[in-house]
Curated annotation (Swiss-Prot):
<feature type="topological domain" description="Periplasmic">
    <location>
        <begin position="29"/>
        <end position="133"/>
    </location>
</feature>
<comment type="similarity">
    <text>Belongs to the CcmE/CycJ family.</text>
</comment>
<dbReference type="GO" id="GO:0005886">
    <property type="term" value="C:plasma membrane"/>
</dbReference>
<dbReference type="Pfam" id="PF03100">
    <property type="entry name" value="CcmE"/>
</dbReference>
<dbReference type="InterPro" id="IPR004329">
    <property type="entry name" value="CcmE"/>
</dbReference>
<comment type="function">
    <text>Heme chaperone required for the biogenesis of c-type cytochromes. Transiently binds heme delivered by CcmC and transfers the heme to apo-cytochromes in a process facilitated by CcmF and CcmH.</text>
</comment>
<keyword id="KW-0479">Metal-binding</keyword>
<keyword id="KW-0201">Cytochrome c-type biogenesis</keyword>
<feature type="binding site" description="axial binding residue">
    <location>
        <position position="124"/>
    </location>
    <ligand>
        <name>heme</name>
    </ligand>
</feature>
<dbReference type="InterPro" id="IPR036127">
    <property type="entry name" value="CcmE-like_sf"/>
</dbReference>
<feature type="transmembrane region" description="Helical; Signal-anchor for type II membrane protein">
    <location>
        <begin position="8"/>
        <end position="28"/>
    </location>
</feature>
<feature type="topological domain" description="Cytoplasmic">
    <location>
        <begin position="1"/>
        <end position="7"/>
    </location>
</feature>
<keyword id="KW-1003">Cell membrane</keyword>
<protein>
    <recommendedName>
        <fullName>Cytochrome c-type biogenesis protein CcmE</fullName>
    </recommendedName>
</protein>
<keyword id="KW-0349">Heme</keyword>
<dbReference type="GO" id="GO:0020037">
    <property type="term" value="F:heme binding"/>
</dbReference>
<keyword id="KW-0812">Transmembrane</keyword>
Length: 133
């Protein structure tokens, strides 16, 4: 085999190897990125039956608790959606606070949540630490 062909073969092999590495890195990063849709964007995705995350603010005086589920409204100050959730809410969940819910859009006004995440700003400090002088 000529030197020229050997060099071309080695260069092609290195290029293919590096391409595979970049592909696997990008695929892994895509799976680990946690983004969410706004309420307005999620309404457009109605009945997709795809697991999505939706972020917004809990509407004041909208939280209804029963023995089996919690129902509340979430808004992005443009549109609102009713969220139905069965489970224990995070301790920081409250009205007029930010939340991200994960689940499926049932119709253009109802979201069935599997998980509720309470959002907080960078100044958050747990109550236990606030009491320590």
């Amino acid at each position: 085999m000529k030197k020229k062909h050997k060099r071309l073969l080695i260069t092609s092999g290195i290029f293919c190897f590096l391409s595979c590495i970049v592909f696997f890195i990008l695929t892994t990063l895509k799976e680990n990125i946690s983004f969410f849709y706004t309420v307005s964007e999620a309404i457009v995705l109605q009945n997709s039956q795809k697991l999505i995350r939706v972020g917004g603010m809990v509407v004041e005086n909208s939280v209804i608790r029963s023995e089996s589920e919690v129902i509340f409204q979430m808004t992005d100050f443009n549109k609102s959606v009713v969220v139905k959730y069965q489970g224990i809410l995070p301790p920081m969940f409250s009205e007029k606070s930010g939340v991200v819910v994960q689940g499926k859009m049932f119709d253009n006004s109802t979201f069935l949540a599997d998980t509720v995440f309470a959002k907080h700003d960078e100044n958050y400090m747990p109550k236990v630490l606030k009491q320590i002088p």
